[in-house]
């Protein structure tokens, strides 16, 4: 069993984070796996202090403890100096970067977190995984079964999955667009196609007008560029 705990939330202290992670570790027992995600909220000094304390819970890895690739690289060096052996995973530093390869060039991470939708699809992620050469964790945003199925397809296509995928976010939605949603059973997801059901989803008139205006603006701008 694997659990991810969000840390470094604006309203929380390090003591709060330690208490939550300890509770999760106790619930999973010594054989469960615990990972934490700071979403880039710490500076290097904060991250070093926090990870030194969190390390006693036998973390699988710390995801995006700092915002920039340079900070992640500095943090890994400083963790090694003080003898703290905790993996660093890069998420935002890959999917929001113009050059994801800098994570490897600067030795900024031990693990790559790949999300299909923001990275441009399954094939793009497979190419990126090969390019990075790091152990991969396939993860998702808060998506319907249609999006989760793409993540499952990526996971199935990778030669190795050393860590559990982070694809159980469908439970955070109140409903799904698929008649036969992907549901985790015994810690696993089926590899299969998922199609939206027959239920219609209609935007409000206000939202529809906003998007139509946005489309017209974009098309007008594209036409001006093409006419130069």
Tell what function each PLM region has.
Residues 5-149, 175-177, 182-184:
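Catalytic core of soluble alpha/beta enzymes
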Residues 142-228:
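Flexible C-terminal active-site loop/helix
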């Amino acid at each position: 069993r694997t659990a991810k705990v969000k840390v470094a939330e604006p309203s929380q202290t390090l003591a709060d984070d330690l208490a939550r992670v300890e509770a999760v570790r106790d619930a999973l027992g010594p054989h469960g796996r615990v990972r934490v995600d700071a979403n880039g909220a710490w500076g290097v000094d904060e991250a070093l202090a926090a990870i030194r304390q969190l390390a006693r819970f036998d973390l699988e890895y710390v995801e995006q403890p700092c915002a920039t690739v340079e900070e992640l690289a500095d943090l890994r060096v400083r963790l090694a100096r003080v003898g703290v052996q905790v993996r660093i995973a890069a998420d935002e530093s890959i999917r929001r970067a113009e050059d994801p390869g800098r994570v490897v060039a600067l030795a900024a991470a031990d693990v790559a977190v790949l999300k299909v939708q923001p990275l441009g699809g399954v094939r793009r992620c497979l190419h990126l995984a090969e390019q990075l050469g790091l152990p991969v964790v396939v993860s998702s945003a808060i998506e319907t079964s249609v999006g989760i199925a793409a993540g499952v397809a990526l996971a199935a296509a990778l030669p190795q999955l050393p860590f559990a995928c982070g694809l159980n976010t469908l439970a955070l939605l109140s409903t799904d667009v698929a008649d036969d949603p992907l549901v985790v059973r015994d810690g696993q997801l089926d590899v299969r196609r998922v199609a939206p059901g027959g239920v219609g989803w209609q935007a409000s008139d206000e939202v529809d007008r906003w998007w139509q205006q946005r489309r017209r603006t974009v098309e007008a701008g594209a036409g001006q560029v093409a006419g130069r």
